[in-house]
Amino acid sequence: MNVLLGGLVIFATFVTLCNGSCYVIRHKIVPGETIKECTDLKGNKHPLDSRWRTEDCELCACRDIEISCCSLVSTPVGYDRHNCRKIFNKETCKISVVEKTDPNRPCGVSGWIS
């Protein structure tokens, strides 16, 4: 029974870690033309085969047929929403969960969704 329970915990952790928030932007391909750079959603140009972090805490990559971007932010789940609140730090791309009455005291979080 303990082996089964341990396996389920590992599986649940794996599913949580793999539940990423990503999207893809396909290039407009013109026959006979070669892609040398990518243009992101804000109009910024990036060299082919480059990677960058956006202001919105996403990690993006420029490839020959698309730009792919994935969120770097993990969202807390399973915490006391009545007594605690989330604080987002845009510089570190992290969310912390703290007590509403004392923001210096962290709250317990049972899981994170990436």
Swiss-Prot record:
Signal peptide per UniProt: 1-20
Coiled-coil annotated residue ranges, if any: none
InterPro entries recorded: PSP94
Gene3D superfamilies to which the protein is assigned, alphabetical: 2.20.25.590, Complement Module, domain 1
Alphabetized UniProt keyword annotations: Disulfide bond, Secreted, Signal
Subcellular compartments: Secreted
One Pfam match: PSP94
Positions of disulphide bridges: 22-70, 38-62, 57-93, 60-69, 84-107
Example of a GO cellular component annotation carried by this entry: extracellular region
Family: Belongs to the beta-microseminoprotein family.
Family matches, as PANTHER family: BETA-MICROSEMINOPROTEIN
Protein name from the UniProt record: Beta-microseminoprotein E1
